[in-house]
Amino acid sequence: GSSGGLITFGRT
């Protein structure tokens, strides 16, 4: 992903 958080970083 892009920008979402630390835990959801990469899952968009």
Swiss-Prot record:
Q: What name does UniProt use for this protein?
A: Periviscerokinin-1
- Per the record, residues carrying Threonine amide are T12
Tissue localization of expression is: Expressed in abdominal perisympathetic organs and abdominal ganglia.
Where is this chain's protein located in or outside the cell?
Secreted
One Pfam family matching this protein: Periviscerokin
List, in alphabetical order, the GO biological process terms annotated in this UniProt record: neuropeptide signaling pathway
Q: Keyword Secreted, does the record have it?
A: yes
Q: What is the species listed in this Swiss-Prot or TrEMBL entry?
A: Derocalymma versicolor (Cockroach)
